[in-house]
Each structure stands twice: as C-alpha cells, then as structure tokens.
C-alpha cells in the first residue's frame, strides 16, 4: 500500500473540494496517484470536474505588452516573492515582454533576441540579474497574438505595476468595426478569461484525450444503464462540459444571462460590422509548476539538534 501523507490529502482536497476521508480513500484506492484519485472521486460523484489540475506554487511575474493589433505575454519565474517585488526584476520582465512583440518563436527565440539599441541578449541580461540578486530565475514561456484588422485586448490581474501581475491575458478580436468599442469589449472578455480559465475557444480546441476521459467518467458513473440511454447521457454530459470549459459557450461574467458567443453577436451592431473572437492566451503565474515544500518547523529544529 502506498504511503499516503497529509500533504497528499490536502493537495487532493484543494483540487476537488471533497472531504478528507473521501480523499484518503481515493488515494488508497489509486496507490497515491493524485490524478487517478481525482477521477476516482468524480466517478463516485464526490468531486467536480477540474478544468486544469495542478498546484500553483512558483513565484515571479507575468507581463503583457500591447501595440494595437499585436500583443505579447511572458512569464518569468523566481524563487521568492521578495525578488518579484525587486525593481530590477520588474524592469527586466517588462522589457522582455516588449522584446517579445518582435521576436518570432518561443522561449529560445526570445532569449536570443537583443534589447533595442544593445548587443545584450535577453538571456545575457537574465544571467546578469541572477548574478546580481543571487537567486535563480527562469524565462518560462512566451506567446504572441496578431490580427490584420481589429484589436488585441489585454488584461493583467493582481497587478503590481503597469502591465505586471499574477495573471496575464491576451484576446484577439478580428473586425473592421470601431476600434474604441472593440478595445472595451476585448478587455471585458479578457477579464472574463482571467476569471473563468477556459480550456479552449470552442469544443474543437479540446484534445481528444480530455474528451475521452470525460466520456469514461460519465460512462462509469452511469454503469448498468442501457446502451442507448448511456449514449444520450454521455452526449448530454459532454455538452454541459463544453459549456463549462469553452470560452464561446461560457456564461459571460459581466452578464451571465448571455454566453460569450451571444455577446459577440450582439456587439456587431455597435461595432459596425462582424466581430470574431480569433483566439486568446491566459498565463497564470506558476501554472502547472510544483514547488517542493521545505520541512516543517519541528523537523528543522530536530535536524539542527542532531548537529
């Protein structure tokens, strides 16, 4: 039997909202596999679907930089929140986002890019910062959105300085319509994305493995029912799932009586033409990163006592 720790139970409770004893049972039944335990609880009807599992533990900052029809977002991680409040660190993250506007490619391309008017690359500057501050830092990821017509709207949540915060969102709206109106609408949708964390724009953007996983959970929860009934249950369940995790089908946070898709359709009159939500990017600081927890205070004292 796997060694089930209190930390594992706590982690599972945070992911699922299930009771402590149910979480312990799930971990015992799945030999301590957290993701399998999430599915076990859901099959038993003891947990809600987790759109994106994973503890968020890394420090650092997310930055966005916009230039009308194109915008970029970057995430730079540090070991401590203390460094994230450092002026030099914040300046680096902000400048890296500006460079990302014109860099083609992912992290490696951005690291190799030069700061404007300088022979120093982004990677070199980061190494200098590490040496100066004395803490490890990582340029973790970067993304960019561009439209030929329309706007790229941005939003930063938990902002610590202009364009810097814990969550950064880009939203691409393609339209020949009024730019001022599109910018306002785009920002509202970006705020929605920050709040709801959709998996994809629509159902076609969800990978097949995720769909199969949801289908299997629905089948096992309704095992024993006739095949034709089960097929309808799975179909209905997936439709509900898509409404929960796809941006266009989600209830709009600013007016939950409408979906985002309906809001876009109604916006065409004010915009003066069709409005298409072409894409979005949402970066949450530390998303999917697990940071090792240090020993508790009692353990530290015991270790020190041993010499």
From Swiss-Prot:
Protein name: Elongation factor Ts
UniProt-annotated stretches for the region Involved in Mg(2+) ion dislocation from EF-Tu: 80-83
Domain of life of the source: Bacteria
Gene3D superfamilies: 1.10.286.20, DNA helicase RuvA subunit, C-terminal domain (1.10.8.10), Elongation factor Ts, dimerisation domain (3.30.479.20)
PROSITE patterns: EF_TS_1, EF_TS_2
SUPFAM superfamilies: Elongation factor Ts (EF-Ts), dimerisation domain, UBA-like
A UniProt-annotated Pfam family: EF_TS
Magnesium keyword on record: no
Gene that produces this protein: tsf
Keywords: Cytoplasm, Elongation factor, Protein biosynthesis
GO cellular component: a single term: cytoplasm
């Amino acid at each position: 039997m796997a060694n089930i720790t209190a930390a594992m139970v706590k982690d599972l409770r945070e992911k699922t909202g299930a009771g402590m004893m149910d979480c312990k049972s799930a971990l015992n039944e799945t030999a301590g596999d957290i993701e399998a335990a999430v599915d076990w609880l859901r099959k038993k009807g003891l947990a809600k679907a987790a759109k994106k599992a994973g503890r968020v533990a890394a420090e650092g900052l997310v930055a966005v930089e916009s230039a009308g029809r194109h915008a970029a977002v970057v995430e730079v991680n540090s070991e401590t929140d203390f460094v994230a409040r450092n002026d030099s660190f914040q300046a680096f993250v902000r400048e890296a986002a500006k460079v990302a506007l014109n860099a083609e490619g992912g992290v490696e391309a951005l690291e190799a890019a030069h700061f404007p008017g300088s022979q120093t690359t982004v990677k070199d500057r980061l190494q200098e910062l590490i040496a100066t501050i004395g803490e490890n830092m990582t340029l973790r990821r970067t993304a960019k959105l561009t439209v030929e017509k329309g706007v790229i709207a941005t939003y930063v949540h938990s902002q610590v300085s202009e364009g810097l915060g814990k969550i950064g969102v880009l939203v691409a709206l393609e339209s020949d319509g009024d730019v001022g109106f599109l910018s306002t609408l785009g920002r509202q949708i970006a705020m929605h994305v920050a709040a709801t964390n959709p998996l994809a724009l629509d159902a076609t953007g969800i990978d097949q493995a995720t769909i199969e996983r949801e289908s299997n959970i629905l089948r096992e929860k309704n095992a024993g029912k006739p095949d034709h009934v089960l097929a309808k249950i799975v179909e209905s369940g997936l439709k509900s799932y898509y409404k929960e995790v796809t941006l266009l089908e989600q209830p709009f946070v600013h007016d939950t009586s409408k979906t985002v898709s309906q809001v876009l359709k109604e916006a065409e009159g004010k915009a003066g033409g069709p409005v298409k939500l072409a894409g979005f990017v949402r970066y949450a600081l530390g998303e999917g990163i697990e940071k090792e927890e240090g020993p508790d205070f009692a353990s530290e004292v015991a270790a020190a006592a041993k010499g």
